């Protein structure tokens, strides 16, 4: 059996490319999504492959980023949002908890919100205490949310692909220290 070894970041990138190639309704956006550094390398080359309409940056307003995603999902889009730090998602909790997580229940299972919210966790260089928290347990206690945290590249790719296909919101945690690990 010959398995290709990838970094965690390349596995995320590969999953995004695969999902976006298979379904033109998959959109990837967030702060830095179209940046030359590509959110720790995870979105590199996506804008060139899929264009500005499907891979784009947005103004810094986490609540609006998330609300936009919910709106797109109601138009049958599957969105992948990236918040480069988990703490930024706290500014979108109203949308995540009161809208996305409850939408399927509020509509008797007739409408879903197929969004993936990628949250980067872990301390980085020069990061203060406001940018180095692990808030997984907060999200794990919200009915209607699925919470994922892959420990290796192989699992990250498979779990991200599954998350994108899920009909309901998924919080996808990525530890920044894992992005350059190989598995």
What is each of the regions a protein language model found here?
Residues 180-183:
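Glycine/aspartate-rich loop-and-adjacent alpha/beta segment that forms the canonical ThDP
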Residues 2-178:
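Thiamine diphosphate
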